[in-house]
Amino acid sequence: MCRYSRTLIGFLYIACGTGLLLIALVRTVGSAQPAQPGIHVEILGIRNSIGAVACALFEAPEGFPTGYLRFATNIMMVKVRATKATCDFADIAPGTYALAVIHDENRDGELSTNWMGLPQEGYGFSNDAKGILGAPSFEAASFSYNGESLKMTIALQY
């Protein structure tokens, strides 16, 4: 085999390897997943990993926030992992919504209160809405959703 043949073969190996590397890089960069449509909620301020987090999505004021079992458009229970939780609502039509979230530590499906009616478990609302001597109104917690990907955070209070 002549000297030029070995050089040519070596060059082809290098060129081929570089080409495959470039193809792999382009496929990796080009395959980044776009954000999925839906409402993606990160729950902050969870004090422990006991129980679950309940996220209730409402599209009307009726039943907000305490009547979530009857009136919520979507309800999601997610396990708390290392004091973190995320609720991802998919297939949601564009519109106006409000979110209510509780940290259901005892997993009884409701916000536990003491003898005075004060919450003993964590709770929070979209827009960080707060009520005066009670839960906030739907209007205070409401937000517009356009059908694309919406990310929000809700900080719990205890």
What are these regions (language model features)?
Residues 1-9:
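N-terminal secretory signal peptides that target proteins for export/translocation
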Residues 2, 27-61, 110-158:
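Primarily secretory-pathway and cell-envelope proteins
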Residues 11-27:
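Bacterial N-terminal signal peptides
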Residues 56-76:
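Short amphipathic beta-strand segments in non-cytosolic proteins
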Residues 77-83, 145-146:
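Short proline/glycine- and polar residue-rich coil/turn motifs
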Residues 89-91:
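Short, flexible loop/turn segments at beta-strand junctions in immunoglobulin-like
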Residues 95-101:
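A short tyrosine-centered beta-strand micro-motif
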Residues 102-106:
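Acidic, divalent-cation-chelating loop motifs in proteins
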